[in-house]
A protein has these predicted regions:
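N-terminal glycine/serine-rich phosphate-binding loop of ATP-dependent small-molecule kinases
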Residues: 1-93, 204-210, 375-382, 448
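Active-site core segments that coordinate phosphate-bearing ligands/cofactors
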Residues: 8-9, 104, 108-155, 165-180, ...
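Structural signal for short hydrophobic segments within the conserved structured cores
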Residues: 30-34, 189, 321, 420
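A generic structural motif
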Residues: 34-35, 98, 245
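Short, conserved phosphate/pyrophosphate- and ester-handling motifs at nucleotide-, phospho-/glycolipid
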Residues: 49, 100, 214
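Short beta-strand-loop/turn "lid" adjacent to the catalytic site in phosphate-handling enzymes
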Residues: 67-98, 118-120, 143, 147-168, ...
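A structural motif corresponding to the C-terminal end of an alpha-helix
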Residues: 180-187
């Protein structure tokens, strides 16, 4: 072991592969971003060129970051995702992504009453994909494609596998459920515990570690582990988790185990994240949200592709309410960021959990107007994580576990660090509070 040892974490995201090399203190020694196209062939479809995003992107990231001191590598990725592959592990169908209508589950409205993410989306992905490529060698989510390209091991972690329920039943691939989709279990990827070594990265002496779901990787290095800590993940998807000591169910929200022993987290994923904000950027002219008049901002309902928690209504669509001639691009941009902040506040309040602090992580933390809007909408300071590539950093820590450089996932807490604290603005407090009430009423929230 050398003080110069580094591990690499690769995060397959919605719009790019982000990767970092990190030392034993979690200091990023190198980083790279490999962009890829997000295809929207129809309003209710969302897909990748899986070969570009899931195979070539991670290989390019490895090529840019690997060095003689690289001890291990792990991959994080969004869920759910799925493609069919040929005998060489190359994708041969579109890479289907979360929220795509091809994963629409019949009678999915029951998800409103569930306290875990709705099940069956990946099964519907598999049914469609198997119909397109019935003779494929495998049906793999993004991390399996990447891991095979990197090491020849088509492997995913248990957390990713569990999101495919009922295909994976907690102990293995369910032959009946897979057969119902036209697939045999031997064409599904191997499943292992995150943070264990399963192979060697091609052309190197580095260990391939099993990674995890992107949100889980972000969580382990965010330091939001105490009761009342709220973790806001600002990526293409907005994810809000409040740490609680005892699991409980709230209609419309998800409750899942925390990585910290004895803790749970309540909240969920929303479409009021980067996909919505990037769309606003494309259709609205230039304007600095910081220069908007606090009293002259409309209200967005940010549902350009439906909403997940707490509404679970994929057919909802966006609304811009209260627009008048006194407003400009800056006002409309501020309204978009506020909409994201309002969703954060709504998910926190619906949970009924006490709040100690808010920690923001993810690539969106680089966007100061977004962070300011979350602070203003919640009325609380926002602690912004130092490393924006949180999922990649968390994956790098899992690499350290596999390489024997760490002994416990709890040790990842020392990698958590704060870049800055964004305080709510007194000038915006009153108008933002009033717009939040309008947002709740317009969206039909139970809090209205």
């Amino acid at each position: 072991m050398s003080r110069d040892d580094v591990t690499i974490g690769i995060d397959i995201g919605t719009t790019a592969v982000k990767a970092v090399a990190a030392d034993d203190n979690g200091r990023v020694t190198a980083r790279v971003r490999i962009g890829h196209q997000l295809a929207v062939p129809a309003p209710d479809r969302l897909e990748h060129d899986a070969d570009e995003a899931w195979r070539r992107g991670p290989l390019a990231a490895l090529d840019r970051l690997v060095g003689p001191d690289t001890r291990a590598l792990a991959v994080a990725a969004m869920v759910p995702s799925l493609t069919a592959v040929d005998p060489a592990g190359r994708p041969i169908t579109p890479g289907l992504l979360y929220g795509d209508a091809r994963g629409r589950v019949p009678n999915a409205s029951v998800a409103r009453a569930q306290s875990v993410p709705s099940v069956g989306e990946t099964a519907e992905f598999l049914r469609w994909t198997a119909g397109q490529a019935p003779d494929a060698s495998g049906y793999w989510p993004a991390p399996a494609v990447a891991n095979y390209a990197l090491s020849g091991e088509a492997v995913i972690d248990y957390a990713t596998a569990v999101t495919t329920l009922p295909l994976f039943d907690g102990t293995g691939w369910n032959a009946t459920a897979c057969a119902d989709c036209g697939v045999t279990v031997d064409r599904m990827p191997r499943v292992e515990t995150f943070g264990v070594g399963v192979g060697q990265v091609r052309g190197t002496g580095a260990v391939l570690a099993v990674g995890a779901v992107d949100a889980l990787c972000e969580q382990i290095v965010a330091g939001a582990d105490r009761d009342g800590d709220v973790l806001v993940l600002c990526g293409a998807t907005l994810i809000v988790w409040t740490t609680i000591s005892a699991a409980r169910q709230v209609p419309g929200l998800w409750t899942i185990p925390h990585t910290a022993p004895g803790k749970s987290q309540i909240g969920g994923a929303s479409n009021a994240g980067g996909l919505f904000l990037n769309w606003v950027d494309r259709v609205i002219g230039p304007g600095d949200p910081a220069l908007a008049d606090p009293r002259r901002v409309p209200v967005w309902l940010p549902y350009i592709r439906g909403e997940r928690t707490p509404l679970h209504e994929p057919d909802r669509r966006a609304v811009l309410d209260g627009v008048d001639l006194s407003q400009d691009a800056a006002s409309v941009r501020r309204a978009a960021y506020e909409a994201s902040g309002f969703v954060v506040r709504q998910l926190i309040e619906l949970s009924g959990a006490p709040v100690a602090r808010i920690v923001a992580a993810g690539g969106g933390t680089r966007i100061q107007p977004w962070m300011q809007a979350i602070a203003d909408a919640t009325g609380r300071p926002v602690e912004v994580s130092r490393v924006a590539e949180g999922a990649a950093l968390g994956a790098a820590f899992l690499g350290r576990l596999a390489a024997g450089l760490e002994s416990s996932i709890a040790d990842a807490a020392r990698w958590a660090s704060t870049d800055r604290i964004v305080e709510p603005s007194a000038d915006w407090a009153g108008p933002t509070k009033e717009r939040y009430r309008r947002f709740l009423a317009l969206s039909g929230s139970k809090l209205a």
